[in-house]
Curated annotation (Swiss-Prot):
<dbReference type="Pfam" id="PF00370">
    <property type="entry name" value="FGGY_N"/>
</dbReference>
<dbReference type="GO" id="GO:0019150">
    <property type="term" value="F:D-ribulokinase activity"/>
</dbReference>
<dbReference type="GO" id="GO:0009536">
    <property type="term" value="C:plastid"/>
</dbReference>
<feature type="binding site">
    <location>
        <position position="60"/>
    </location>
    <ligand>
        <name>substrate</name>
    </ligand>
</feature>
<keyword id="KW-0809">Transit peptide</keyword>
<protein>
    <recommendedName>
        <fullName>D-ribulose kinase</fullName>
        <ecNumber>2.7.1.47</ecNumber>
    </recommendedName>
</protein>
<keyword id="KW-0934">Plastid</keyword>
<feature type="binding site">
    <location>
        <begin position="64"/>
        <end position="67"/>
    </location>
    <ligand>
        <name>substrate</name>
    </ligand>
</feature>
<keyword id="KW-0067">ATP-binding</keyword>
<feature type="binding site">
    <location>
        <position position="338"/>
    </location>
    <ligand>
        <name>ATP</name>
    </ligand>
</feature>
<keyword id="KW-0547">Nucleotide-binding</keyword>
<feature type="binding site">
    <location>
        <position position="278"/>
    </location>
    <ligand>
        <name>substrate</name>
    </ligand>
</feature>
<dbReference type="InterPro" id="IPR018485">
    <property type="entry name" value="FGGY_C"/>
</dbReference>
<comment type="function">
    <text>Exhibits ATP hydrolysis without substrate. Can phosphorylate D-ribulose with low efficiency.</text>
</comment>
<feature type="transit peptide" description="Chloroplast">
    <location>
        <begin position="1"/>
        <end position="38"/>
    </location>
</feature>
<dbReference type="GO" id="GO:0005829">
    <property type="term" value="C:cytosol"/>
</dbReference>
<dbReference type="GO" id="GO:0005524">
    <property type="term" value="F:ATP binding"/>
</dbReference>
Amino acid sequence: MLILRQFQISSFELFQSPKQTGFYSSSRSVPLPRTRFYSDFRVMSGNKGTNYEKLYLGMDFGTSGGRFTVIDEQGEIKAQGKREYPPFMKEESMGWASSWKATLFSLLEDIPVTVRSLVSSISLDGTSATTLILNSESGEVLCQPYLYNQSCPDALPEVKSIAPANHTVCSGTSTLCKLVSWWNTEVPNRESAVLLHQADWLLWLLHGRLGVSDYNNALKVGYDPESESYPSWLLGQPYSQLLPKVQAPGTSIGNLKESFTRQFGFPDDCIVCTGTTDSIAAFLAARATEPGKAVTSLGSTLAIKLLSTKRVDDARYGVYSHRLDDKWLVGGASNTGGAILRQLFSDEQLERLSQEINPMVGSPLDYYPLQSSGERFPIADPNLAPRLLPRPESDVEFLHGILESIARIEGKGYKLLKELGATEAEEVLTAGGGAKNDKWIKIRQRVLGLPVKKAVHTEASYGASLLALKGAKQNSGL
């Protein structure tokens, strides 16, 4: 039985000043306004033995909001919900850390108390290359978070001078470029800092052990998942002491902090496990396990992942490989995607206009839909300009052109991966919000020339819950 509840949360008091521990050092206090959050959550009921089973919590912190999914050992969903990031923070990078923390606490509060009491393991994902620099003693965030798509061209020449040609870090948006850019500002006591990714930082809030990451998030700072170590060319740099320790995704870090077990009613022996990136979590959710299987995540951005027997890395095209057990998850992420659709259309318009599109007929419109200049994949060009002209009088034709153009970008991505030596894509599963648009799936199937299906599970938070399950099994020796 499925019970859907929608309710309004009472006013949530946000953090009063960025000067608090764990936030930004600032010369002035900036009071943050009160706001209201809305949350959806679903609770699955009607299962025997619920009072005795162990459950596993995964959370996803994407580009626009957070989600949670709670599963049992068989992978059946027991509860799920979502939160948007505080709206007044969306255009203010100084507010991102407090926004993420507020959303984390809200998601935990939204999980039904009876479900929380059964959660034995927690993991979560964050956006790739979203980077924070912290004081290694206090955990205070020392500067604005560097967001996933933020480029640091000032650091690129230095990074290219030390890294192998066409390495993953040789991109202005890489975590390493962000670290070098910050290091070169020569802030006081920089040697006592530590680098964390978004997922690492949120997990640290839960377990309290500063300086732990996973090899998916650490890829873009230069970590080599094949040798399971940082390369010598990186360890020889003065800022290498800021690099976090790296473990496999889904590895137990330690118990949930006592403050969380008391406040939210989680079990005392609940563990916290290393996480992953949002696109990897979406791939895990789809449960694509054979080489040639691919997952396109259609969220605010477009991310493609292809399971390959061969590792492919080429920063010229924004292509990189993540380790997935004994195989490689090859892909990249484009700045096109759902964000530009939301900028141009309301949800109601998208649903209504999509119904009028004939997906079997190609659109003659040739767009490159971006919110602003700059692209990562399949073209790594920080100056690539958006192209949304000419605009036809018909909104249906306009939307058709955008959806088809995004599909063409997706197709160019898979073609590029094949040319670079990855296993050829045979089937594409779809995750993210775009998976709900049946017309778009049919357009993509025609453009790609491949079977395109919805993944059974489309939320990255489900993939994160599978990591929590993995960590719990490893921790118990199963």
